[in-house]
C-alpha cells in the first residue's frame, strides 16, 4: 500500500553523494556522510533529511570513536526513521564498503507513525536504487549488536565491522 508520501530531492542527493565513491580530495572524503537519518516532514507529506542527525566520515576517529554505536544512539526511542549507513567491513577475502538501508520502527512508536513509515518504505526504496542490504529493527536489542548488521552484510564471512572484530 502506498502512502502518497513523496521523497524530497535532498534525500536523493544525500543518497547519491553517499553511493558514488569518486576520487575525492582528503577534505571532500571527510565531508562524506557515514550515516544519516531520514524522517517525515511535519505535515507527513515528504520524507526529508533529519537535521543534525548524521555522522561524517571525517568525524570517525576524531569526535566519533565507534561510528556504529554512535549511529545506534541517534535512533529515537519513540518514533520511526529510515536511515542509510555506510558500512565498512572485512570478510576473509577482502575489505568492503556497502550502503545499508535501515527501517527503524520501535515498538514504543505511535501506531499511526508505524503505519505511515511502513507504507512509505517502498517509496523511498524505489528512489534509493542499488542498495544491496536492508535491515529492519523494532528495538535496540536488534541493532545494538553489530553482529546483526554483519549477518545482513555477509553472514559468517564477515570478520570485522568498522574495524572491530566480531
UniProtKB/Swiss-Prot annotation:
Species lineage: Eukaryota, Metazoa, Chordata, Craniata, Vertebrata
Sequence similarity: Belongs to the actin-binding proteins ADF family.
Name of the protein described by the UniProt record: Cofilin-1
Annotated ADF-H domain residues: 4-153
Residue list for modification N6-acetyllysine: 13, 73, 144
GO molecular function annotations of the record: actin filament binding; phosphatidylinositol bisphosphate binding; protein phosphatase binding; signaling receptor binding
Pfam families: Cofilin_ADF (PF00241)
Subcellular location: Nucleus matrix; Cytoplasm, Cytoskeleton; Cell projection, Ruffle membrane; Cell projection, Lamellipodium membrane
Membrane topology (UniProt): Peripheral membrane protein
Keyword Lipid biosynthesis assigned: no
Positions of modified residues (Phosphothreonine): 25, 63
Record PTM Phosphoserine, positions in chain: 3, 8, 41, 108, 156
